Amino acid sequence: MQAYFEQIEKVRYEGSQSSNPFAFRHYNPDQEILGKRMADHLRFAVAYWHTFCWNGSDMFGVGSFARPWQQSGDALELAKRKADIAFEFFQKLSVPYYCFHDVDVAPEGNSLKEYLHNIAVITDVLAEKQQDSGVKLLWGTANCFTNPRYGAGAATNPDPDVFAWAATQVFTAMNATKTLGGENYVLWGGREGYETLLNTDLRQEREQIGRFMQMVVEHKHKIGFQGTLLIEPKPQEPTKHQYDYDVATVYGFLKQFGLEKEIKVNVEANHATLAGHSFHHEIATAVALGVFGSVDANRGDPQLGWDTDQFPNSVEENTLIMYEILKAGGFTTGGLNFDAKVRRQSTDRYDLFHAHIGAMDTMALALKAAARMIEDDKLNQLVAKRYAGWNGELGQQILQGNASLESLAQYAESHQLAPQHQSGQQELLENLVNRHLFG
C-alpha cells in the first residue's frame, strides 16, 4: 500500500535547538518527569473526526480539503482506506492513542442493518491495525447528533423510537470500544438540550436522559467493561442550551440520578470558554468534585461565540491545567485528546503534522513547568497556610458537624472575636507561576 504521508518517516524528539518542522523540540516521550515517563503523564490521543472526517467545510463554504477517502465510491472500502491512512499518521506522529465516534470509522449506511454490519467489519479492521501498530484506543463514543433523526435530541427526544435508536448506537459503540481495549467511553449530548422552551418539557427530558445514563452504567457492568464512563460538558451549540452545561451542572445531574460514583467528566478547553469559564476553572472543579477523568485539549477564541476547536498553543494556560492534574495524581484511564482541527485554509496534508507537533510540544512544556511548581511546593504551601485555621479546634468542630449557629454565636461573643482580613497575595502567586514559566 502506498504511503499517504510519504515525505515523513517518523516524528522524533530532536531538542529545543532543532529547526526541523517535523521534529519535537520539547516532547521527549522517554524523559522522566516526577518519576514517570513524559509519554505516560500526557497520554496523547488523535481525534479521528477532526483529523480524518472533517472536509474543511463551514457554514459559508463547501469542503476545502481533497482527502482521497472522502471521494465518491464504496463507503466501506473508503472507510478502510481512511483507517490505513489514520494508522499511518498515528505511527509516524509517535502518538500512543486515538479516539473515535462510531460513524467516524464506519459508514452509517441506509438502515440499522447496514450500520451494524459496517461497525462489525471496521471493528475487526481497527483491531488488526492496533495489534500491528501498538496504537491503543483512549476512548470511543457514538455520534447521536448528526443524523436528522436527532434534530430534537437522542436521549431527550420526544419520540421513544429515536431514544431506542440512540440506545442501539451506544450499545454497539460501547461493545466495539470494549472489543478494542478502549480505556474510556464518552457521552456527549450534542443535541440533548432545547431550541425553545415553548415546546420543551424540561422535567420529562431530564428524566429521559437520566434513565439513559443509568442504562449505560448497567450495560457497562453487564459486559464487564473495565474502562471509565465520561460525560463531556458543553453549554450550547448546536442547541441553544445543553443540559450538560458545565462540570458543576453535570455533577448535579449525576447526583440526582445516583451516578456520581459511576461517571466522570471529559473536560474540553473550548467548551469551558463557551460556558464563560476558564479551562483552569473547569479542571479544578472536576478535581474538587471527584469526577475528573480526561481532557479534550484544544482552545477556543474568546472573541468568537462558537466552538473553533483550535490546537492548544498556550504554555501559560496549560501549565495551570497540568499543575491541577499532577496535584490530583495524574491521569488514570484518561489522557490528552486533541479535539482540534487545522484551519480551513490549511489544505496541505502535512499541516496535520504541524498542528499536532506544536500541540504536543506545548503540552510537554506545560508539563515541565507544572512539575517545577510541584517540586518547588511554594504555591501549595501558601494555599495551605491560607486555610490553616481550619485544621485547628474550631475549624474541625465546624467541619465535623459538632458546631451550630448558636454555638458559634456563643463562641464569637465569649471570645470577643474581631477577625481581620488577611491578604490573598494574588500578585505574589502570579509572580511565582511566572518564575516557573520563564525563569
Swiss-Prot record:
Residues bound to Mg(2+) 2 are 268, 271, 307, 309
What organism is this sequence from? Pectobacterium atrosepticum (strain SCRI 1043 / ATCC BAA-672)
Report the catalytic activity: alpha-D-xylose = alpha-D-xylulofuranose
Q: Which GO terms describe its molecular function?
A: magnesium ion binding; xylose isomerase activity
- Keywords in alphabetical order: Carbohydrate metabolism, Cytoplasm, Isomerase, Magnesium, Metal-binding, Xylose metabolism
| Annotated EC | 5.3.1.5
Any Gene Ontology biological process: D-xylose metabolic process
PROSITE patterns given in the database record: XYLOSE_ISOMERASE
InterPro entries in alphabetical order: Xyl_isomerase-like_sf, Xylose_isom_bac, Xylose_isomerase
Per UniProt, subcellular location reads as:
Cytoplasm
Question: Cross-referenced NCBIfam families, in alphabetical order?
Answer: PRK05474.1 (NF003998), xylose_isom_A (TIGR02630)
Residues of the active site are: 101, 104
**Cellular component GO terms, alphabetical:** cytoplasm
Details of cofactor binding: Binds 2 magnesium ions per subunit.
Q: Which cofactor does it need?
A: Mg(2+)
Q: Which SUPFAM superfamilies match?
A: Xylose isomerase-like (SSF51658)
The record's note on quaternary structure and interaction partners says: Homotetramer.
* Official protein name in the record: Xylose isomerase
What family is this protein classified in?
Belongs to the xylose isomerase family.
Q: So where does Mg(2+) 1 get bound?
A: 232, 268, 296, 339
Q: What class of enzyme is it?
A: isomerase
Predominant location category: cytoplasm
Q: Highest lineage ranks of the organism?
A: Bacteria, Pseudomonadati, Pseudomonadota, Gammaproteobacteria, Enterobacterales
